[in-house]
Amino acid sequence: MSFLIRIGICILSCIIITSCDNNAKPDEQIDSTSKKYVLNEFGQITSTEFSTEAFEPSQNCQECHPNHYQEWSESMHAYTMQDPIFFSGWAQAQHDYPETGERFCVQCHNPVAFLTGEDLSDFSTKEELLGSDLPAQIKDGISCDVCHSTTSLSRTVHADDNIAAVADYHLYPGEGIKFGSIQDPEANEYHESDYNPIFNRSELCLPCHDLTIRGVEAEITFTEWNRIPGLAMSGALSCQDCHMKQKDDGTHDHHFTGVDVDLSYPFGESPLYNEIEILLKSAVDIKFEYYNVTLPDSISKGETLIIPVLVSSLTAHSIPSGTSFSREAWLEVVIRNDQGNIIYQSGVIGNNTESLDLTDVDLLLFTTQLMGENGESVNSITNAYSIINNSLPAFSDRYHQYNYDVVNDDNFLTINVRMLFRSFKPHMLNEHPDLLSNLPVFEMESICDTIYLKL
């Protein structure tokens, strides 16, 4: 299905949904009360109404919400201050930007520390931080209360050249009220529960899932979604629809499943491994066709076999998204003869930790590359002055053609195409060889066909 057709269906669906209820009103924030804070030019707190004690430790939620707590504890939200890769990047940011680097990363990886002004610059490893006497609210990273004390929507983080933190939060912790998406929450003796429709909107994932720096669209998952006309106008197919799927009992999954894997686990044993695999398998479709070009049933020796491949995104943001510069998705194409021998290949790696051959002229690779001030390749967003974007846009199609000259007397040829994904380019893990061995490559989609040779 073409991009225009998919968008048309989306817009039509939105019109139908909206028109079904003549009394429908736009979602508005029910309670816009929030506590205030002031930042200086370096992104540091100069005054704040927030205190660490106002936020509940996530473990306090476990007794009444054991499933939600368990899911959160396995999520990347709970892992934000435990990830060795984050600590490496954070150290580099602090080295390059001594006045602002610490706060720049903390603004999203630890909102409680950011809003209360808690300085975390003394901690260079997760072991140091978790072994410290810091309160649990800080160690939790992105805790339950960070989201469930939200009262109104935030905006994209636009960082300037000095990368000073500017994250915009609207939270109301410490007042005995938890906000969420349930319209008629059950009363309980522990806290007041208030419905807020913003919990069904993609904007709830701001400010952290949309970042520009020096005008460079470095991590813009929300913007990618927001640029789709049908979705932006209606709010249909929100982030939560895919990443917090509704369960049979009406509650939502709190794994926040994306594409990031906790690499501290042995290969394939991360708690979210299977969920990530399922999510990625629903992200794209690939076919041997493009408009009037199709794969032939047979071919003669001496002819050129044209292999048309159409990659169609089924995803409401780019592939890859988020830290797209560290991620890569690509097509692996293998042709075998009737003896099973490989006679052509593109996008093949020997193992999960091997880098792609970027000199392969046939390689179809979806990724981005950050560029520094002098046009050099860089790996850190804090040093990005431009970006080369070769990602697959939301709900778009990408056509790629492979040509193979048939020179042997084989009875048939077998063509296998797979779309593969990994959350880190191997060189991004050079400082963490212990984690590199746990890096998975996921198969997103695969197709296969056989071409017979004419006698």
Feature-to-residue mapping (PLM):
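Extracellular Ig-like/FN3 beta-sandwich strand-entry sites
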Residues: 304, 410-414
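Sec-dependent signal peptide recognition
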Residues: 2-10
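C-terminal motif of bacterial Sec signal peptides marking the signal peptidase cleavage site
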Residues: 18-19
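Long, well-ordered hydrophobic secondary-structure segments characteristic of membrane-embedded
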Residues: 63, 82-121
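Primarily the internal scaffold of c-type cytochrome electron-transfer domains
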Residues: 26-52, 71-97, 122-385, 390-394, ...
